[in-house]
Structures are given as structure tokens and as C-alpha cells.
Regions:
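Intrinsically disordered, low-complexity coil segments
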Residues: 134-142, 228-231
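Predominantly late transmembrane helices and immediately cytosolic-facing juxtamembrane segments
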Residues: 12, 16-125, 146-168, 172-199, ...
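Structured surface patches comprising rigid loops and adjacent beta-strands/short helices at the edges
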Residues: 443-447
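Membrane-interface helix-loop junction between the first two transmembrane segments
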Residues: 109, 128-139, 161
Length: 481
């Protein structure tokens, strides 16, 4: 296989036995390191299991090949070439074929999974349409409660599907059929996600129940026919079958109850689903998720949700609208996205061993906050809607968004967690000050917008500063170099 390298390509990496700036760590006692330019790593030790041993053996093989190539090209390798060699090695590891690293290649997000996520973009858009009718007044609490409930239901379906396919999804026809069936049923749910959703109770809840039944079947099918599962997998899959069937049963029972009494019991099903999944934490912890795959799935849905926010601020750009406000709204969206993107690219430990439950739960809340911020921005572009309540909604959702970002700290790279208490202190202080200022200045839209802009970029600046102080070098994956 031909190798293609870009001599100017650089990438920040974290390798065992090597500092984040490419220098060798001072306290390394490894007989394999014979010259400063070599980057061999330990392959044995109490902290290295069989899988990690295979990874490190393969890495050392690539190190030797890359170093030999460099020596042949230049007739020798000096200490000054150490950093470029490091990037070259890592680039080669990342671009090797799947066959060359069989058994140690991370699971990639399938195109079918990306296709599946598009139905959630449509679902969130139809739910957001709940607020299109409020051109002259702030939405009542009943509309906000409906919005929160419908969004939580859609995100639960996404969460359960993502968790299953992260651990047990394969390039199998049955998996693809299951995804397409759920996509079809989500259309029925989305079409009933409006002010009159109770008028579509049977349609909406019938589709929801069938989705739970489909998820239960996939877990049962994997439990019954898979030959590559152990006792932990059986426990997880068995619990999935039971909990999905119970939630399905609650949803189905709620239909005749609503038809005869008018009572809405389906929120109990929603609460049960989330609580049951949280109760499985120990089993999921014993069988860690494929975190790189999970992080990528979450990143893609966050990007799609921010795409809805970009569409949401379009009304600020209509003829006759305040140019300053459309500039500020655009910069706010960019700043929020950059904070998440930078954190995902540079701070998040993509090889974390974790159950994934907490990571997904934080993202469910974050996507709800992003979607709610989109609604707030749309309302802020409507001059006849009372200013103070929509301003405070915006402030509250930003507060939730950045609290979620703080929650990701537990999934950060270990060498970046040293500053976590400063990180918490700075951002919490900024949020409290921001909320207080918005209570005082929320009656003036321009002042409130400027305060919000200052918050968004001050937090982004804090993240950059703490990352810089942790690495002692401003090298942040293309954002700043």
C-alpha cells in the first residue's frame, strides 16, 4: 500500500512516554529507548492488558518503519527532527488500512447511523414549530411543558438506539432494517408533535410503543442468536428487553386510559425509561462503551442541532432588522459552537473507559438546551413578544448549556484535569455574574445581547487559557497555532 505524507502536516497527539509537546518525559526507564529520536513505548506491565499490548506492539512496529524511512531519506536523524517524526508516525498510524491493524481498529460511525440521525433533526424542527404561532406574546407554560416533553421523548429514542448500536450494532441486514423501521415510525411521532398533540394521542403513542417494541426485539435477537457475548452482555441485553417491554406496556395502557378519562400517563413511561437505564449503570460500567464511536455520534448530532440554530437566527437578517443584533446573534452561535468543538477536539479523552451513560445523559440535556436557545433566539427576533421573559429564557438555557460543558470535564484527558477546579470556578463565576447582569439589564435588548456575547467569548477564552496553561504551549488542533 502506497503511503502519502504531507511534510507540513502537524497534529497534536498524546502518546505513552511522550509529553504533549513532543518531548520525551524525564522519568522514563525503558531500555528500548536508545536515542532521543526514538519513540518506542512499553509493551508489558501491570497496567497493560492483552489488547493494549497488541496496540503498543503495532505502534512500535510503525515507529521502526517510519524512523528507517526518515533515515534513508536524509541519511540520518538528528534530535531536531524528533517532533516532525512524531507527527509522521502518528499520521501513519491513523491512515493505515483496516486490514493492517485488524483487531485494534476503532469502530467507525456507519453511514446508516448518520442517515438515521437526520430524522431527529426533522423531529426537533417540528417540535420547534410549536412556537411559530407566538408573534405577539410569550409562549404559555403549557406550550413550554409540551416542548420539553416531546423533546425528551425523541432524545430518549435516540439515546437508547445509540447505546445499543454502540455495543452491539454490526453491518447486518437486521440492524439496518431495525433502524429504517424506527425512522419510519418517527415520522408518525413528528407529525403529531404540535400544539394539538393530544388530538393525535393514539397515532403518536402507537408509534412510540412500536419503537420500544422494536428496540426490545433487537436486544432479544442479539441475546438469542449472537455467539460473541458473555455473561455481562447477557445481563445488559436481558435488562434491555425487560425495560423496553415495560415502557412499551405503559405507553399502550396510557392510550385507553386517555381515551376514557383524559388522563395522560405517558410521562410515566418516559420517566421509567430514563430511570431504568440509569439503574443498569453497574452492568454498563463492567462492559465499557466504544467511546470514540460514542463521542463521534454525539458530536454529529450536536453539529446538526447547531445547524438548526443557524436556521433559527435567519429572521435577524430580514430587511429592516437591526444589523448590530444580527451580527451579535451570529457571533453568539459561533462562540457556543467553538466552545463545544474545541472541548471535543482537544480536551475530551476519546479513549476513555466508561459506561457512556453519563456522557449520553449530558448530551441529551445539552441538545435540549441548544434547541431551547434556538427558540429563544427566534423569539428575540420578534419585536412584539415581551422582551424580559424571552431574554431570561435565553440566559437560563445558556446557563444549562455551559453547565453541561462543565460536566464533560470528567471525560477530559488526565493531564488536562489538573486545572479542573479553576475551570469550574471561572465558568461558574462567569455564569452567576451573567445571570445577575441579565436580571438587571434584560429589559434592554442591545445591552442584554452584548452581555451574552461577552459571556460566550469569555468562557471560550477561559477554556483556551486553561488548555494553554496545561500544555505550556498554544497548539490547539487548528483553532490557534
Amino acid at each position: 500500500m502506497a503511503d502519502h505524507y504531507d511534510e507540513n502536516y502537524e497534529e497534536v497527539v498524546s502518546l505513552p512516554g511522550v509529553d504533549t509537546d513532543g518531548e520525551r518525559t524525564e522519568n522514563i526507564d525503558d531500555g528500548r529507548i536508545r536515542r532521543p529520536a526514538e519513540f518506542f513505548v512499553r509493551t508489558t506491565g501491570d497496567d497493560i492488558d492483552e489488547q493494549e499490548h497488541a496496540r503498543r506492539e503495532y505502534f512500535n512496529k510503525v515507529v521502526g518503519e517510519a524512523e528507517n524511512e526518515a533515515i534513508q531519506e536524509k541519511g540520518g536523524l538528528d534530535v531536531g527532527a524528533e517532533s516532525s517524526l512524531l507527527y509522521r508516525i502518528w499520521s501513519r498510524v491513523n491512515h493505515e488500512s483496516e486490514e493492517a491493524v485488524a483487531g485494534i481498529v476503532e469502530k467507525k460511525v456507519e453511514y446508516v447511523e448518520l442517515f438515521f440521525d437526520l430524522i431527529f433533526v426533522y423531529s426537533l424542527r417540528t417540535i420547534n414549530a410549536l412556537f411559530h404561532a407566538y408573534e405577539h406574546s410569550f409562549p404559555p407554560m403549557s406550550a413550554i411543558q409540551t416542548f420539553l416533553f416531546l423533546t425528551a421523548v425523541v432524545m430518549q429514542v435516540w439515546m437508547f438506539t445509540t447505546m445499543f448500536f454502540n455495543r452491539y450494532g454490526r453491518k447486518a441486514l437486521r440492524d439496518y432494517i431495525s433502524i429504517f423501521i424506527n425512522m419510519y415510525l418517527l415520522y408518525y411521532m413528528a407529525s403529531g408533535s404540535n400544539h394539538h398533540w393530544l388530538d393525535h394521542y393514539i397515532r403518536y403513542h402507537g408509534a412510540w410503543a412500536l419503537i420500544m417494541l422494536n428496540l426490545a426485539y433487537r436486544s432479544w435477537d442479539k441475546l438469542r442468536f449472537s455467539t460473541h457475548i458473555d455473561d455481562i452482555d447477557r445481563k445488559i441485553l436481558g435488562a434491555n428487553v425487560m425495560h423496553h417491554l415495560i415502557e412499551c406496556g405503559i405507553i399502550l395502557v396510557s392510550i385507553p386510559v386517555h381515551e376514557t378519562t383524559g388522563l395522560v400517563l405517558s410521562p410515566l413511561a418516559l420517566i421509567y425509561g430514563y430511570a431504568a437505564k440509569a439503574a443498569e449503570h453497574r452492568a454498563y460500567k463492567a462492559r465499557p462503551c466504544d467511546f470514540p464511536h460514542l463521542a463521534e455520534r454525539n458530536l454529529l448530532l450536536v453539529i446538526l442541532t447547531f445547524g438548526e440554530m443557524i436556521i433559527g437566527i435567519a429572521s435577524f437578517f430580514e430587511t429592516g432588522k437591526n444589523v448590530l443584533l444580527n451580527i451579535i446573534s451570529f457571533l453568539i452561535v459561533i462562540g457556543m459552537f467553538l466552545s463545544y468543538g474545541f472541548f471535543n477536539d482537544n480536551v475530551l479523552d476519546h479513549h476513555k473507559k466508561t459506561s457512556g451513560l453519563g456522557f449520553l445523559a449530558i448530551h441529551v440535556i445539552m441538545i435540549l438546551a441548544i434547541n431551547s436557545t434556538t427558540i429563544a433566539l427566534e423569539l428575540l427576533a420578534r419585536p412584539l413578544v415581551p422582551l424580559f421573559p424571552k431574554t431570561m429564557w435565553m440566559a437560563a438555557m445558556l446557563f444549562v448549556y455551559y453547565i453541561c460543558l462543565l460536566g464533560f470535564e470528567r471525560y477530559a484527558k488526565e493531564h488536562l484535569r489538573a486545572n479542573r477546579f479553576r475551570f469550574f470556578g471561572y465558568i461558574l463565576s462567569a455564569l452567576i455574574i451573567y445571570f445577575g447582569l441579565m436580571l438587571l439589564a434584560g429589559h434592554n435588548q442591545t445591552v442584554g445581547a452584548l452581555i451574552t456575547l461577552a459571556l460566550v467569548y469569555s468562557i471560550f477564552g477561559v477554556i483556551l487559557h486553561l488548555h494553554h496553561s496545561s500544555l505550556r504551549k498554544m497548539k490547539v488542533g487548528g483553532y490557534i497555532s
